[in-house]
């Protein structure tokens, strides 16, 4: 995982990094302090370790449902979906996502017009607290498979 402050008004391809200049990277600890976002690295190759970590998160966050969501250029209405995912939103429950394959960005907004970009890759688990404005996009590879976690069954939830 990599984390940095984004330029205030990114222009062009939103799938690019959009660092401020000079780049201002932050740590997972700083991200937690600034935005309340939690991060865990999950070793997907170590089944016992993975189950232990996921079980702890599920218990702590009262998770009962999961799904696997794949974003790729082959999906129906890909461009429209990407526009929808990039719209800033807040949720009524924590957004919990584990990247199973590929790479993506979650942008979080701890203060008005001050976005932090979180680049996630395979094995990265993120918990975005309810009520925090966030948005989602892919990297230029246009592919990510995410396992999402919910406290209740949710139909049609986006990023």
UniProtKB/Swiss-Prot annotation:
Probable inactive acireductone dioxygenase. Keywords: Cytoplasm, Nucleus. GO terms for biological process: L-methionine salvage from methylthioadenosine; methionine metabolic process. This is Probable inactive acireductone dioxygenase 2. Pfam families: ARD. It is found in: Cytoplasm; Nucleus. It comes from Caenorhabditis briggsae. GO terms for cellular component: cytoplasm; nucleus. Its main location: cytoplasm. GO terms for molecular function: acireductone dioxygenase [iron(II)-requiring] activity. The lineage of its organism: Eukaryota, Metazoa, Ecdysozoa, Nematoda, Chromadorea. SUPFAM superfamilies: RmlC-like cupins. Belongs to the acireductone dioxygenase (ARD) family. The keyword Nucleus applies.
